[in-house]
Amino acid sequence: MSQLTQIWIKRMHRGPMDPVSSAKVVSGRGIVGNANQGGKRQVTIVSSQNWEDITAPLGATPDPRLRRANLLVSDVDFVDSRGKLLKIGKVRIRIYGETRPCEQMEAAVPGLQKAMSVPWGGGAFGEVLDDGEIAVGDAVALVGDQGSH
């Protein structure tokens, strides 16, 4: 079963990724306390299996916090997920696209930006559709389009 394994909040642009065990989310805004609010990139998500696969050629699996995503989920393949819904507990997130790796990846680990340049290698981003709370251990499912609300 897929689950939410990590949550990180970025309190300011280019700031550290602070781990938390749960977070409140607001429809149309994102994670409460996170620097990215509103728009289509309210939440960024990476899959642990994908992270392990793309970083394997680097010789060691770096801490996924270096990806600078808000959420780490297990057993989810984001390839062709644009427009689908990611359900985390009772909260839905509409996936709008893939997150592209930036120069911060290369600064963190030499070769990481290139390793992440494969399709969907940087994970996904999306918009929160429901107010609620998410917590490490919540069940996760990627499902087809079920409308916006």
Per-region residue spans from a language model:
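Metal-cofactor-dependent catalytic cores
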Residues: 1-149
